[in-house]
Curated annotation (Swiss-Prot):
Full protein name: CRISPR system Cmr subunit Cmr1-2
Family: Belongs to the CRISPR system Cmr1 family.
GO biological process: defense response to virus
Source organism (scientific name): Pyrococcus furiosus (strain ATCC 43587 / DSM 3638 / JCM 8422 / Vc1)
Keyword annotations of the record: Antiviral defense, Cytoplasm
Coiled coil: none
Recorded name of the encoding gene: cmr1-2
Domain of life: Archaea
Pfam families: RAMPs (PF03787)
Transmembrane residue ranges: none
Length: 187
């Protein structure tokens, strides 16, 4: 059996949820979904217009309604950090908090809830739900008995981590992870 364990750390806030929209969730199904997307993006160039061949290989790696996956994906949260986007921004940006605040507004406007305090006339900023903050640690494990499909899944995860992101607002820079350690084993 082939196995790889990716120890990861969030370098930008990660907005990923499950059935409970208020609490963060880092699930295997979500990770597998993003891996599948990157597999399609990369393998499309190899398979060209042969969509049936692409679909067949994709089903073997990630599974389908007819066949189970040949690669087992397990995602775990190791260390959760929760925070406030604006507090985090001020510690990063020191004297440029105004510029940073506008940046945060632009990238994370859909997850911020702004309300004006009637007494102080200041805007109170609260996030609408919890999220995984910078520094949260995760682990993703891939395992398979078939080396070919294992390597394809491993490449897909590698591309997801390095070129993509997890959760929503990933296209705006959220959900970026870095690999702390990669352990590969042949069992």
């Amino acid at each position: 059996m082939y196995e790889a364990i990716f120890d990861l750390e969030a370098i930008t806030p990660l907005f990923m949820r499950g059935a409970d929209a208020r609490s963060p969730e880092f699930s295997s199904a979500s990770v597998k979904g993003v891996m599948r997307w990157w597999f399609r993006a990369l393998a499309g160039g190899y398979f060209g217009n042969n969509i049936e061949a692409l679909k067949e290989v994709e089903e073997k790696i990630f599974g389908s309604t007819r066949n189970k996956s040949r690669v087992f994906v397990r995602a775990e949260v190791e260390d959760v950090k929760k925070g406030n986007i604006y507090r985090q921004a001020s510690s990063w940006a020191d004297k440029t908090i105004i510029v940073w605040s506008e940046y945060v507004d632009y990238f994370f406007f859909s997850v911020l809830d702004k309300r004006r305090n009637r007494k102080t006339k200041k805007i109170d900023i609260k996030t609408r739900f919890e999220y995984f903050d910078v520094g949260s640690k995760f682990s993703i494990s891939l395992s398979s008995t078939d080396e070919r499909y294992f390597r394809l899944a491993e490449a897909s995860l590698w591309m997801t981590i390095n070129l993509g992101g997890f959760g929503f607002r990933a296209r705006r820079g959220a959900g970026s992870l870095k690999v702390q350690m990669l352990r590969e084993m042949l069992l």
